[in-house]
């Protein structure tokens, strides 16, 4: 029984590692064990990138008007514009009139380790992440055209609920007006696009909305990773992730044209998304612009405009943290950027329960502890059944050893007598394994809840833990975890095989080393889980001991 239990825990541990590695590869990251031989070291995406006209998207075949030929790429100097800074209670945004693009966005209530606001959108020599829009279908105003900004307030004043920034450009007989509306207490920027034909011939413009980003990850860890890259959602195809690697190789597929959905750029804890007006037909695209610069976008045909005619359409731009409840209120499916993968069906209820505990306890650290206790209580009957089954197997160990010795030269006869013994004593040799296997998906789902939740970012617990999303600065929790794992191994009978005994002694050290680099919230969960497991094992052994004493007394 001890050998089987040791093997079970080794299999359980390796299953966790392999499942995690599979998750990594499914999210476009290199395997921990089989790194890709052709991994490219992409050059940084600078502020310049492609030539202005070359990086304007071409009209999709389904959007192009009859006889419309996309403008050929032309070498041109980078346009020079003015930077307009807009400040609300949630964001500080920078709009570049060269293209009318959102070129920088700081999240004022989300902070880095040094206390500076998180910068989500940005353009400099090392990083490119932009929200762009424009017109195609001829040489029309686009994100390389210099716009004129209308005068007006740039800071949301006390008592003010919204603030408008209006930009205008005219080119080749088409006037294009963008209006950005920033709201108090919101990460959503409403955008309005007014297109007027000021020329003498009909035009058929197509509006594009895109997010352009370099392929570099914002944060890197050798022991855990989350998805970074574009995503597309439609009511028909649901949530669809695109890896930068697939886009570069031309393997990325996008949903068919529709009148709903959105496009997004996703990274750990944060995301941005263009959400077009519902009910308006549009198509999707995902492309590589430069060796380390990609874009995902939407193209919406605006129809044929006669001279003097105007057409208007709306869209929304979200750029902020992946707060699940907030995302649910913005548009259908946007909460899926907080990616739990194939364990969503378990992870979402766990996060819901964690939120409820936080509403009661007011601290995410104590909420993690509370959730761990509740999970242990739910699985207590299964754990008791597991220990009971293993206890019976332990009692049968002398008889099983005798059978092995008696029939060591006849495996078939040995197995027959073993099965007869199991039937007589009503023991299932796998009875100790199944309860543990059932719990594995829940443990993994909770792991991803804690790793993915931006609510843990900057959330303190007590004393030295000021941020549950970063490693313990003094490594106290990993050390406590190592001690708790060591105690667990000592509570179990020593395996008869010396090699297995050494493995069981080394495992706490190996796991503890890994957890030195894990977020404190995750380590807190494992520490509490281990301590509860020790208490649970002691209680179950006590219950089994009382049962045996009572049985002996009756006999």
Curated annotation (Swiss-Prot):
Molecular functions (GO terms): membrane insertase activity
Gene Ontology BP terms: protein insertion into membrane; protein transport
Membrane topology recorded in Swiss-Prot or TrEMBL: Multi-pass membrane protein
Compartments, as annotated in UniProt: Cell inner membrane
GO CC, alphabetical: plasma membrane
Similarity annotation: Belongs to the OXA1/ALB3/YidC family. Type 1 subfamily.
Family matches, as PANTHER family: CYTOCHROME C OXIDASE ASSEMBLY PROTEIN COX18, MITOCHONDRIAL, OXA1
Quaternary assembly: Interacts with the Sec translocase complex via SecD. Specifically interacts with transmembrane segments of nascent integral membrane proteins during membrane integration.
Protein name: Membrane protein insertase YidC
Protein species of origin: Cupriavidus metallidurans (strain ATCC 43123 / DSM 2839 / NBRC 102507 / CH34)
Classification of source organism: Bacteria, Pseudomonadati, Pseudomonadota, Betaproteobacteria, Burkholderiales
């Amino acid at each position: 029984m001890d050998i089987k239990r040791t093997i079970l825990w080794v299999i359980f541990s390796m299953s966790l590692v392999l499942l995690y590695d599979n998750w990594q590869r499914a999210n476009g990251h290199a395997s921990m064990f089989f790194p890709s031989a052709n991994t490219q070291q992409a050059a940084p995406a600078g502020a310049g990138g492609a030539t202005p006209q070359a990086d304007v998207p071409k009209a999709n075949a389904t959007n192009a008007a009859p006889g419309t030929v996309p403008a050929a790429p032309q070498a041109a100097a980078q346009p020079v514009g003015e930077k307009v800074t807009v400040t609300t209670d949630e964001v500080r945004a920078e709009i570049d009139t060269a293209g009318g693009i959102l070129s920088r966005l700081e999240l004022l209530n989300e902070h880095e380790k040094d206390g500076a606001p998180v910068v989500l959108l940005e353009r400099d020599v090392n990083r490119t992440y932009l929200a762009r829009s424009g017109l195609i279908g001829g040489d029309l105003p686009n994100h390389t055209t210099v716009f004129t900004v209308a005068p007006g307030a740039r800071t949301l004043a006390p008592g003010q609920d919204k603030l408008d920034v209006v930009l205008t450009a005219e080119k080749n007989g088409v006037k294009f007006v963008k209006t950005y509306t920033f709201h108090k207490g919101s990460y959503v920027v409403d955008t309005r696009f007014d297109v007027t034909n000021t020329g003498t011939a009909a035009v058929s413009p197509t509006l594009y909305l895109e997010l352009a980003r370099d392929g570099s990850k914002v944060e890197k860890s050798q022991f855990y990773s989350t998805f970074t890259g574009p995503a597309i959602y439609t009511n028909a195809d649901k949530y669809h992730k695109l890896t930068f690697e697939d886009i570069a190789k031309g393997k990325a597929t996008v949903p068919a044209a529709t009148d709903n959905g959105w496009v997004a750029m996703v990274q750990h804890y944060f995301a941005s998304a263009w959400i077009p007006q519902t009910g308006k037909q549009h198509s999707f695209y995902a492309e590589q612009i430069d060796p380390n610069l990609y874009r995902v976008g939407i193209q919406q045909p605006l129809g044929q405009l006669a001279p003097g005619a105007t057409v208007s359409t709306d869209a929304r731009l979200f750029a902020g943290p992946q707060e699940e409840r907030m995302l649910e209120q913005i548009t259908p499916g946007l909460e899926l950027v907080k990616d739990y993968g194939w364990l969503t069906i378990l992870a979402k209820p766990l996060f819901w329960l964690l939120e409820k505990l936080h509403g009661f306890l007011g601290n995410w650290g104590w909420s993690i502890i509370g959730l761990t206790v509740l999970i242990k209580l739910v699985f207590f009957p299964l754990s008791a059944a597991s220990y009971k089954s293993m206890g019976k197997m332990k009692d049968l160990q002398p008889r099983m050893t005798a059978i092995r010795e008696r029939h060591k030269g006849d495996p078939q006869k040995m197995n027959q007598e073993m099965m007869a013994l199991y039937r007589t004593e009503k023991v299932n040799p796998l009875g100790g394994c199944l309860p543990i296997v059932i719990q594995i998906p829940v443990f993994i789902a909770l792991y991803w809840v804690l790793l993915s939740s931006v609510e843990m970012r900057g959330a303190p617990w007590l004393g030295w833990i000021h941020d549950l999303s970063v490693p313990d600065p003094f490594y106290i929790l990993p050390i406590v975890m190592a001690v708790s794992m060591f105690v667990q191994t000592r509570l179990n009978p020593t395996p008869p095989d010396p090699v297995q005994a050494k493995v069981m002694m080394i495992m706490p050290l190996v796991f503890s080393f890994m957890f030195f680099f894990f977020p404190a919230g995750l380590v807190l969960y494992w520490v509490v889980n281990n301590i509860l497991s020790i208490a649970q094992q002691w209680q179950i052994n006590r219950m089994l001991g009382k049962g045996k004493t009572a049985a002996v007394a009756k006999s």
